[in-house]
């Protein structure tokens, strides 16, 4: 190889000398590159997280290279031939497209002799590149994930918002939650219950919350804690929840002032009521704050105002002292939307450094919350790699779910900031086949959350029709009074708990993938 290269260099030098001597111009000559290329680098870099799905790799050398595309099948990722490999124009880089599987370690192998230099000299070494997903770190965020585990929402029991109809507590579920319910939850394997609560409808003209109402809420909190459950208590559908657009309008400063004052006085009263409660109680500043009917996103001014509201709430809670000085507090971004929270939430300043991030995720929306169309038939009846393209949400399969939740891991969990899914779920569908896909989705989604280190609380609205008349809004797992399983809760709840808590390393995505139903 070396002798051949020396001969080439001598021949080239002679030709160059003759050409220069015979020329009567000032023309410049480019000396062509010779010799075999040398490997320089690859992207993604070795510390990158390669998640399931299609991935592009770029392998770069020290000079322009040649590659016969017919040899692409000899390049493998985890032993499987890549989808494509080519050099784009005159370039020192080989671009490879391959499917990343569920393995924690990905190994890309380019056999020796496939990469050629400008003069046909081959790179004579095998290139072997590996990427390994790190295990979850040992930090405060992961410890909180283990503490919260799998959880459940009391739905709209204390939700008194809505139209002009007088809605007292329990209007939506007509239940009396107590020891029987919470003991059943604990026995099933739940660790946390979220109690969504509307407060402003129980205030007098001086913004004082009814003592009877405070006691009623406290009684339910007490029953849950007595059963050994953690409790997340929030503000839910209060008067300011959809008023963000007005509060952020610079021409409506009076609205901003009034809403801010209301938030402070509300949280001061709630925090004082529970200031002696221990670590099992967690506060959550807001539910899904947004502007009017705009759920898809707001303006920079609205995001800024919501960040201020979170700070006001945290300050009000901390100022009450007692155990509230160090109590964990959950905060969320616009509409509690995952991406909007990631992109726009500014964590409040907190002397206790005990702030968690709360997000909600019902993705893909059509399959999870609104599968039934206006004609009563299912528009979205399947999900995942075996779904019917005509009856599923496009580009929202297993790959989408894994990457969606992993963003929370990178932004929060790996940085030691606890994060939880305050709401998730998928309504009971109207056909057996669609419900088979629903169960597959729930198991896969829960396992993806486990991989990301995210605890989760399923939404349960105690829809009495579940199991008989299913479809949109049918989200029931436990009877809100007795704690008995409803609909398919007895089957689905243990499955979800296992998926989001099991430490069995053999229980991985490929195990669930193989159980995917097919369209019938």
Per-segment meaning from a language model:
Residues 135-192, 207, 411:
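N-terminal carbohydrate-binding accessory modules
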Residues 173-192, 203, 207-236, 241-285, ...:
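An active-site-proximal structural segment forming one wall of the substrate-binding cleft
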Residues 398-485:
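Substrate-binding cleft of secreted/luminal carbohydrate-active enzymes
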């Amino acid at each position: 190889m070396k002798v051949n290269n020396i001969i080439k260099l001598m021949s080239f030098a002679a030709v160059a000398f003759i050409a220069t001597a015979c020329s009567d111009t000032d023309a410049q000559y480019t000396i062509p590159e010779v010799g075999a290329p040398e490997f320089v680098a690859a992207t993604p870099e070795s510390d990158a997280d390669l998640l399931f799905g299609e991935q592009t790799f770029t392998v770069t050398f020290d000079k322009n290279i040649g590659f016969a595309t017919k040899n692409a099948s000899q390049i493998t990722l985890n032993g499987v031939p890549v989808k494509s490999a080519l050099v784009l124009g005159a370039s020192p880089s080989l671009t490879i497209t391959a499917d990343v599987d569920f393995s924690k370690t990905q190994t890309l192998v380019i056999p020796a002799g496939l990469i050629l230099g400008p003069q046909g000299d081959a790179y004579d070494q095998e290139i072997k590149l590996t990427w390994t997903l790190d295990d979850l770190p040992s930090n405060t965020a992961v410890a909180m994930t283990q503490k919260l585990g799998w959880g459940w929402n009391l739905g709209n029991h204390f939700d008194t918002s809505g139209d002009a109809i007088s809605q007292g507590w329990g209007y939506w579920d007509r239940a009396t939650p107590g020891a029987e319910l919470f003991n059943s939850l604990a026995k099933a394997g739940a660790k946390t219950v979220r109690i969504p609560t509307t407060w402003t409808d129980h205030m007098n003209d001086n913004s004082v919350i009814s003592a009877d109402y405070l006691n009623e809420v406290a009684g339910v909190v007490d029953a849950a804690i007595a059963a050994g459950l953690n409790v997340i208590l929030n503000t839910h559908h209060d008067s300011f929840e959809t008023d963000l657009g007005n509060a952020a309008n610079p021409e409506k400063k009076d609205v901003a002032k009034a809403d801010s004052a209301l938030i402070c006085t509300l949280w001061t009263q709630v925090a004082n009521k529970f200031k002696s409660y221990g670590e099992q109680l967690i506060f959550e500043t807001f539910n899904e704050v947004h502007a009017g009917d705009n759920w898809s996103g707001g303006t920079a001014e609205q995001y800024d105002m919501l960040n201020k509201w979170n700070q006001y709430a945290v300050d009000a809670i901390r100022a009450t002292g007692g155990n509230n000085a160090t109590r964990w507090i959950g905060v969320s971004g616009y509409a509690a939307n995952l991406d909007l929270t990631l992109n726009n939430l500014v964590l409040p300043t907190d002397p206790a450094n005990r702030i968690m991030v709360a997000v909600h995720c019902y993705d893909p929306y059509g399959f999870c919350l609104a599968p039934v169309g206006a004609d009563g038939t299912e528009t979205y009846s399947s999900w995942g790699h075996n779904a019917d393209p005509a009856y599923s949400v496009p580009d929202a399969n297993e790959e989408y779910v894994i990457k969606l939740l992993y963003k929370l891991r990178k932004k929060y969990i790996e940085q030691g900031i606890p994060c939880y899914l305050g709401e998730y779920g998928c309504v009971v569908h109207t056909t057996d086949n669609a419900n088979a896909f629903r169960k597959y989705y729930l198991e896969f989604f829960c396992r993806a959350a486990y991989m990301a280190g995210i605890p989760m609380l399923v939404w349960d609205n105690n829809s009495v029709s579940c199991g008989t008349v299913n479809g949109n809004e049918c989200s029931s797992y436990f009877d809100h009074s007795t704690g008995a399983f409803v609909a398919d809760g007895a089957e689905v709840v243990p499955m979800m708990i296992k998926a989001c808590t099991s430490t069995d390393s053999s229980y991985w995505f490929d195990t669930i993938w193989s159980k995917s139903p097919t369209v019938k």
